[in-house]
């Protein structure tokens, strides 16, 4: 227990993040299955829209703050960044420990917020006046705000740690332009966290004082404006979605170049600039989430154009991955299957994003299932596919064990069918005008909702199968002899699993 509770070892802390993220992911998945069960037939199942919205809100918060971010940044980031830099550990090992241990209390606060009073049924955006004292009395929203505060502090500390580590602890020979793409992606992600989270903290603190200390930041009666909250929230919220996907971009670059048998990704400098461009542009497009609040036509024109510009660096990344794959004789290992699935489905999600960027179109599609379909394609088939690819790819390094490849391929097919069956029909529902965040719908929408719910059940089976595959691997203890052929990245020069203290003598990297 002491080893885990007080650990300052980046590998142990990374493992804690993985376990925490997997556990939170099961909770978040359970909530999503409840949502799909409710929508699996017309009429009521739970019979209470407040509870339904509490489930939707908790599903979003758990998946974002307690599943994707801990696994990608905390798990893969902690494990791989020091190994890829040739650093003995993170720059601030004890702060690293605190970053992790802030998350269980944060998750507990969120779960408690659902259990007291009526729960926080505000949606993950927590817009006032719905989240204000009149519409949401009681402690639920306050507890959710404190949960976000803790998760935010955790991420800010982690961000400072990663930035410092990369600036100060690169091994001799690893110049910035030769730094692995995954490390670059984590650094850019950390910068985005550092710049966006304080704004969220400000917004939810003002909401807290509006609710409890009689201020009126977001109350027109006292000269406030609920639209101010939306601007503050989305100034955080849009960079946040890039925070969720950028580490995935980094992992996919490594996996594709490795599996293509090439020593680096096509146009790796361009890949770095593309990620920097995405990170920068991510801060100046936030109001595309607010096309329906009545902004000036010139404001809408700007946010439409700026949003579409993000498609350019994203396209550079997609086509560089395809160019990396070009001309190779692929063996379809499980990791490359997930990576190919990522490229294909992330592109679909990106295209629906370009559709929604048009302010005039978005006014029709805003708050319909078209938006739900869009962001689940980039999250449920972008971020999650990247996590799956990365986990399978680096599992032999982390554990020194092998997974059952045949099962993993079957599991990929099950998940691929499941997620597409769940989310593709939602485009049709959105185009037909089915609104988000309602527990019931007119009979006309029944067919595609039934298909979507069947898809979610298939995905659930896929996830359970995945956990069984990991269990089987840990029980069977098949040791790795050679973890990978012709490795293109230095973390593979470690033992499998790596020694508790790798790089106790600093390496010199020559090329």
From Swiss-Prot:
Protein name in UniProt: Cytochrome c oxidase subunit 1
Where along this sequence does the record place binding of Ca(2+)? Answer: 38, 43
Task: Write down the EC number.
Answer: 7.1.1.9
Binding of Mg(2+) occurs at 366-367
Q: What does this protein do?
A: Component of the cytochrome c oxidase, the last enzyme in the mitochondrial electron transport chain which drives oxidative phosphorylation. The respiratory chain contains 3 multisubunit complexes succinate dehydrogenase (complex II, CII), ubiquinol-cytochrome c oxidoreductase (cytochrome b-c1 complex, complex III, CIII) and cytochrome c oxidase (complex IV, CIV), that cooperate to transfer electrons derived from NADH and succinate to molecular oxygen, creating an electrochemical gradient over the inner membrane that drives transmembrane transport and the ATP synthase.
How is this protein situated with respect to the membrane?
Multi-pass membrane protein
Q: Which domain of life is it from?
A: Eukaryota
**Gene behind the chain:** mt:CoI
Pathway(s) the chain acts in = Energy metabolism; oxidative phosphorylation
Mainly resides where? mitochondrion
Say which species the protein is native to.
Drosophila simulans (Fruit fly)
Q: Name one GO biological process term.
A: mitochondrial electron transport, cytochrome c to oxygen
């Amino acid at each position: 227990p002491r080893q885990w509770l007080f650990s300052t070892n980046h590998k142990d802390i990374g493992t804690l993040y993985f376990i925490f993220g997997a556990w939170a992911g099961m909770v978040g998945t359970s909530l999503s299955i409840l949502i799909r069960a409710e929508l699996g037939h017309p009429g009521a199942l739970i019979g209470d829209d407040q509870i339904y919205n509490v489930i939707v809100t908790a599903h979003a918060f758990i998946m974002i703050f307690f599943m994707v971010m801990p696994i990608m940044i905390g798990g893969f980031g902690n494990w791989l960044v020091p190994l890829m830099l040739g650093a003995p550990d993170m720059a601030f090992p004890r702060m690293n420990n605190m970053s992790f241990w802030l998350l269980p209390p944060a998750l507990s606060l969120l779960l408690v917020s659902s259990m007291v009073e009526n729960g926080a049924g505000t949606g993950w955006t927590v817009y006032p006046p719905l989240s204000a004292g009149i519409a949401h009395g009681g402690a639920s929203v306050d507890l959710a705000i404190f949960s976000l505060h803790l998760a935010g502090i955790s991420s800010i500390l982690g961000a400072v740690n990663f930035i410092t580590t990369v600036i100060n602890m690169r091994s001799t020979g690893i110049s910035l332009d030769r730094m692995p793409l995954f490390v670059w992606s984590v650094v850019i992600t950390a910068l985005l966290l550092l710049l966006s989270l304080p704004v969220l903290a400000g917004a939810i603190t003002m909401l807290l004082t509006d609710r409890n200390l009689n201020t009126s930041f977001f109350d027109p009666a006292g000269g406030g404006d609920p639209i101010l909250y939306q601007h503050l929230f989305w100034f955080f919220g849009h960079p946040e979605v890039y925070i969720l996907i950028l580490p995935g971009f980094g992992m996919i670059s490594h996996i594709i170049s490795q599996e293509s048998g090439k020593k680096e990704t096509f146009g790796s400098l361009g890949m770095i600039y593309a990620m920097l461009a995405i990170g920068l542009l991510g801060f100046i497009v936030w109001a595309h989430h607010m096309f329906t609040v009545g902004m000036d036509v010139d404001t809408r024109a700007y946010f439409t154009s700026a949003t579409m510009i993000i498609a350019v660096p994203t396209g550079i990344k997609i086509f560089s991955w395809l160019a990396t794959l070009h001309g190779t004789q692929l063996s379809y290992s499980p990791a490359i299957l997930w990576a190919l699935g990522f490229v294909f489905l992330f592109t679909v999600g990106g295209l629906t994003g370009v559709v929604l960027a048009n302010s005039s179109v978005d006014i029709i599609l805003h708050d319909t299932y078209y938006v739900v379909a869009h962001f689940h394609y980039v999250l449920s088939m972008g971020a999650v596919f990247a996590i799956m690819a990365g986990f399978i790819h680096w599992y032999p390094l982390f554990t020194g064990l092998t997974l059952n490849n045949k099962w993993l391929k079957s599991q990929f097919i099950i998940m691929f069918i499941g997620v597409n069956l769940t989310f593709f029909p939602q485009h049709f529902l959105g185009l037909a005008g089915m609104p988000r965040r309602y527990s019931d719908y007119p009979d006309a929408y029944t067919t595609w909702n039934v298909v979507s719910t069947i898809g979610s059940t298939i995905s659930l089976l896929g996830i359970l199968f995945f956990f069984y595959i990991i269990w089987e691997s840990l029980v069977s203890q098949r040791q790795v002899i050679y973890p990978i052929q012709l490795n293109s990245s230095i973390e593979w020069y470690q033992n499998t699993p790596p020694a508790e203290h790798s790089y106790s003598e600093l390496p010199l990297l020559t090329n």
